Amino acid sequence: MNKNNMLKPYTVHYRDFQNIRLENCFYASDAYEARTLAMEFNKYINEHPNSIDLIRCEKWIKVFV
């Protein structure tokens, strides 16, 4: 598998209407894809995309099967 095509864990942090910080985790190739996935799978983020305040790439471990 090409290193550029590997999926990495991303955490998408966002604030709800009460300003409470929440997060969703996704495996994606880059931060933009993680944002797109968050908008697809989280109704609140889809309706309020500017509620995202951080997208962080978490540490990941290569696993060979």
Report residues per predicted region.
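Short intrinsically disordered terminal tails
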Residues: 1-6, 61-65
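A short, exposed loop/beta-hairpin motif centered on an aromatic-Gly-Thr core
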Residues: 20-33
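Short, mixed-charge low-complexity intrinsically disordered segments
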Residues: 39-65
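Short aromatic-glycine-(Arg/Gly/Cys) micro-motifs in beta-strand/loop hairpins
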Residues: 2-22
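Generic detector of low-complexity/intrinsically disordered segments
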Residues: 8-9, 24, 39, 56
